[in-house]
Amino acid sequence: MKLITNKQGLVGNITVPGDKSMSHRSIMFGAIAEGKTVIRHFLRADDCLGTIKAFKALGVKIEETDEEIIVHGTGFDGLKQADGPLDIGNSGTTIRLMMGILAGRDFDTVILGDESIAKRPMNRVMLPLQEMGAKMHGKDGSEFAPITILGKQSLKRVEYHMPVASAQVKSAIIFAALQADGETIIHEKEKTRDHTEHMIRQFGGEIEMDGLTIRVKGGQKFIGQEMTVPGDVSSAAFFIVAGLIMPNSEIELTHVGLNPTRTGIFDVVEQMGGSLVVKDSSRSTGKLAGTVVVKSSELKGTEIGGDIIPRLIDEIPVIALLATQAEGTTIIKDAAELKVKETNRIDAVATELNKMGADITPTEDGLIIRGKTPLHAANVTSYGDHRIGMMLQIAALLVEDGDVELDRAEAVSVSYPTFFEDIRSLLK
């Protein structure tokens, strides 16, 4: 696909799609709650539609209208054995959280996905669930999908110290803990996104959060809710960076989720001297949301590492692009988790942006980016990774000497089906 290039400014207003993490979880909680859950501003992208498909296969009645998703939940015990394997496509969130949900059911399930899912590590989820009494295994006894979950297991409480900072692993343990005897205690390595914890409370459940320690009791019942999903800050990030690096630009992003566990990119933009203002913030069904305004800015390099990394892990590809347009060196470290995303994002970012003229050195746990560098025409690939694909389109906007051809552009639909349309709507 030929990308949009050689543009002199982006001006206008965008409402980014619903938050991907929250859209997944809204379906999951709606399914295990009792009664009707109505979800507005749901992300109708491949990953989240895959979660709907999976729960329909498990016997949950889900209606889809133009404005709403309506889930008719009948509790954990209302889930039924699927007729065949659950195919969750490209969604790591779906497979890992479903492992926790299905660990305590009284039927067997096989979960599989695409070629990317088949390469992603699942021991990080299987090991704590097995400690709780779950029985599951990967293909040929490995840790890789397809994952077979054996039903009719009694789950027991566990006190678990997480070896990696992962909201997906934490959430899988929480879903299993809701079906276990007693109180499960989870100690996080670093604070990660806490949508699952907040949604437990939103759906009428109880959970204790004290710093990095989480306590959750089994046997809880949930009640269906009405909710509006805020805009996804990870999707907004592409327009935040575009507005900062494109000359003569000012972009307003409305109804963006402002959960502090997700807004690390705001802190980085401030460190780099970028113009970013948050206004009109309000609580949307328990979640903070607001309008984010960005303008063209002169940027300087910075160092990014430590406990901020889980707050911006999905934004690092586009933050790396931002750093190519900053004066000086930017160092990103403590981000080895990027190697086990949809692709090895450390290598993918360095390889593809360097093709375009950037000066980036990949490291074991991050990137060293030397700026400021002009970007040039090139043939690039997304590797089938939606965030790499969208980052490369933002990079292409700066190119003045020819075309940028993106291979596997269709990956963008995983999280942002209208991305290219929204870019065009901002062109002067």
UniProtKB/Swiss-Prot annotation:
Monomer. This is 3-phosphoshikimate 1-carboxyvinyltransferase. Gene3D superfamilies: Enolpyruvate transferase domain. InterPro entries: Enolpyruvate_Tfrase_dom (IPR001986), Enolpyruvate_Tfrase_sf (IPR036968), EPSP_synthase (IPR006264), EPSP_synthase_CS (IPR023193), RNA3'P_cycl/enolpyr_Trfase_a/b (IPR013792). It is found in: Cytoplasm. The active site is at D314. It catalyses: 3-phosphoshikimate + phosphoenolpyruvate = 5-O-(1-carboxyvinyl)-3-phosphoshikimate + phosphate. It comes from the Bacteria. Pathway: Metabolic intermediate biosynthesis; chorismate biosynthesis; chorismate from D-erythrose 4-phosphate and phosphoenolpyruvate: step 6/7. 3-phosphoshikimate binds at K20, S21, R25, S166, Q168, D314, K341. Catalyzes the transfer of the enolpyruvyl moiety of phosphoenolpyruvate (PEP) to the 5-hydroxyl of shikimate-3-phosphate (S3P) to produce enolpyruvyl shikimate-3-phosphate and inorganic phosphate. HAMAP family: EPSP_synth (MF_00210). Its main location: cytoplasm. Keywords: Amino-acid biosynthesis, Aromatic amino acid biosynthesis, Cytoplasm, Transferase. Its EC number is 2.5.1.19. One of its GO terms (molecular function) is 3-phosphoshikimate 1-carboxyvinyltransferase activity. GO terms for biological process: amino acid biosynthetic process; aromatic amino acid family biosynthetic process; chorismate biosynthetic process. The keyword Zinc does not apply. Phosphoenolpyruvate binds at K20, G92, R120, Q168, R345, R387.
